[in-house]
């Protein structure tokens, strides 16, 4: 069971992606115009194929490249492996006998107030096809070597439109918050976010979500070589590139400049050899056919801060904090050379103050802490140590200001994650068929190898992790080896020092 949608039908549809077209087939559960599920399975149970290649990465193709899209819901052939949901298979167009060219341009403008709508959708599609080498045999006309190339270039000013628009801070208010991110708390307990006192006059209504553009490119090509009357060699491939900023409601009012950047690219190539064999009408074995295919797919994906990219330690960096400490002593009885001695013994270091020098990587957060030190100038209790800074709603490297009413992120709050993936797939398949008497026989094999690798980091948490690990191997005093202080005459001064005890098992750097 299932269905097939032809290129003529696809051309009449408003949305022409593989998933959107497949969702029009009966039996496919649709969600937001895309494939939700097939036969009640999760999305992972649906397997996509493009020109016989099992899809890894993006399924996007140029809109003019589709020849047909087939959906198999039940009775899945063995050649598709262990798919538990359904199969969605797209076949791209091949070369034609005569040269052809098509250009298509769609546009709704460049954004809010600059076109038909606020979202700025623009698409340019170009396709070329035709013969490269024609047969010179008048009895067997046609192309010996033909090609088909299609491309789509898409730009959207807002890739995730909202139904009714949204409120955002005015540029003037953003500038004000940049220079004045905090104010003194009326309760005398530290500072408050200035953004928590936003009023309607500080906001403006927009239909287009800010800083959510998307650039996408899709290419597809096919080269057919008619090596003989009964054999055919085909080469093809596709490439997709996407670069966009993700919409985040939390960031939408104040912090849209920090929307995450998503980058992905998928390219796949294949070679296919097909041969058919002649058979007489009275032959017991007819319609003998086989096909051998090899393919390769490369998929890369990344999300990151668009400015910092792979500079992971800049994500959470606010500035340089220097802790000033002094030695602490307490009266205790210590045994030295078999004698108990009352002396002032070293008890460790105490923090006197933490000074701050702003960094340049995150200007808003740097201003936040500069303002903090300005508001509490001379009041050392608010920056005696890192705990006192945090208790008064100050920031350390890796920290972000508290949200506004638990709804919106504060201006300057950084993207906290970084992720990069590199996936590769190699496939080889062979299939053959023949009619033997009144029976149809099909057989073949398939080999598939995948290599999936990735790296991820909670970038702002790196600073918290480093603070917890630094000097973790010298936290205890070596009280077994006291160091009495003597004057120049060898007289005990009543003071005993200790070195820190090294713990190899706690060493983390």
Regions found by a protein language model. Give the residues of each.
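Periplasmic N-terminal accessory/gating domains of Gram-negative outer-membrane beta-barrel systems
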Residues: 1-77, 84-87, 107-108, 127
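Outer-membrane beta-barrel channels and translocator barrels
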Residues: 15, 93, 133-137, 142, ...
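Hydrophobic, lipid-facing positions within transmembrane beta-strands of outer-membrane proteins
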Residues: 34, 86, 99, 122-126, ...
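Extracytoplasmic loops and strand-loop junctions of Gram-negative outer membrane beta-barrel proteins
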Residues: 51, 71-72, 106-111, 201-207, ...
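Short strand-turn segments of transmembrane beta-barrel domains in outer membranes
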Residues: 68-76, 87-133, 151-153, 165, ...
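Transmembrane beta-barrel strands of outer-membrane/channel proteins
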Residues: 101-109, 149-155, 235-241, 292-296, ...
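Transmembrane beta-barrel wall of Gram-negative outer-membrane proteins
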Residues: 120-246, 264-277
